[in-house]
Amino acid sequence: MKRTKTIVTKLLLLTTTAGLLFSCGNGGRSETLSETTLAIETETVQETTELEARQAIPDELPERDFAGYEYRILTYSPTAYEVEELTGDVVEDAKYDRNLKIGERFNVTIRAVPSPGIKELDKELKQSVISGDNAYDIAIPHQITSGPGFITSQSILTWNDVPYVNPDKPWWNQTINETINILGQQYYMAGYVTMPTPFCMFVNKAMLADQGFDDMYHTVREGKWTIDKLIEMTATVSGDLNGDGKMDSADRWGISFNNDNNTLNFMYACGILSVLIEEGRPVPNTNNDRMIAFIEKLYELYHNGNRSLVTTYQNQGELGMGGFKDARILIKCGSVSDLAQLREAEIDVGVSPYPKWDEAQERYATHVDAWNGMLCIPKTADNLERTGIVMEAMAAETYKYVIPAYYDVALGTKYVRDTESMEMLDIIFASVVYDFGYIFDSWNGCTWTAPNLMTRKSTNVASYWQSIEKKVTSHYDKLYAAVEEDIAQRAE
């Protein structure tokens, strides 16, 4: 959609005003200054806004009538995919309008079937496939809990042969096609439709200025936000506030993160994936010089200099977020969803991506938590054209309308306090990566090299890899064999 804008110059405004004054001052004469001395032209300009350009991208879907079909999505986050009525909340109303528009276009009703939890969803889908009841068109499982198991149990189809799903469209994550496949088989898809909440960092801007680092946003823009810079910034912040001679959660810290996914995300931010795909086969990316150098650098941040308050996954809210809100922590690692917790905070909060490994690294990178599920197709799905068309439409409409509402209206007006942080969010959302190992590792240790070694206060990558190599190799051999079997069966 293009907006036509007529540009009227200040000179024209001045001329009109002068003409009115001239008319009034000459006994009601109708002649104006513009009529006698000036010829003013207006210029019509076609201007397309970023939002209009986004919404103008065609989904290239055919017209179909699915005769009132109920399109069922199995999920533990039902409100992301179905909203029953308009509520006045801009994001929820955008989801409602999305489904209504798709429903009218294709004569379908979109239904989110809620599961009480991640394990229950895993069990429900597998049982549904075994019974052959075709209960669901799409399932959105927890990445780690169900990622490999749905493949080895042959519970899902691949997206490769689903018509009308175009992974090159901007509403799909562009890295997942390269990193989450085996022998070219794409069992999972992800994009804006799953409402990702990537990991990021929150910064106390007043503390930052006190430390002499008051232009962090410029550092990010220039590509100079690196792990070395983070170590430098957090080196002199910590202090024993209560004077008890020890550093604990009541004191001042340079940075805080949990010993779980916050720690793991440093690896992704530094451009490292735990598993690579070579000739269609998963190959662990653990015991090498790059990982060793990263682990040594992370150890410095983690354990040296009393700069880091490391929490558990369970107490990160109380200790990490609590200390950040109380202005005792310079930088807090978290995810974009944590912005809601900071809405009423009295400190001046900024947002930034995780740091890169070095300035030579081309782009910033971040991951999403496993709770940001991925899309898969139950093996019992009986109409792949319908499956593809409706999901492609949902992905496209989410990208065009729901995400702008969430991003610009909800984040921009409710949570983010400065334009620079919105700029940082642009960088963060554009840098989401998916790691084969994170999804398919099944807690076997390959992906969690960094958190596990940091917990053990060790940098001995070789020893760690030796302790898990047999288990990891066996795990991926079984996964690879399951895909080979699936390909063979479909070829029969």
Model-derived segments and spans:
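C-terminal motif of bacterial Sec signal peptides marking the signal peptidase cleavage site
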Residues: 20-23
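Conserved C-terminal helix/tail region of periplasmic/extracytoplasmic solute-binding proteins
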Residues: 379-388, 398-492
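Glycine-centered hinge/linker elements that transmit conformational signals in sensory
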Residues: 231-235, 266-267, 272-314
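Periplasmic solute-binding protein
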Residues: 151-154, 173-218, 257-279, 369-378
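Extracytoplasmic/periplasmic substrate-recognition and gating elements
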Residues: 343-411
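Pocket-flanking alpha-helical
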Residues: 81, 119-156, 170-189, 228, ...
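Short, polar/charged alpha-helical segment
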Residues: 83-107, 206
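Hinge/lid segment of periplasmic solute-binding proteins
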Residues: 51-71, 76, 116-119, 143-200
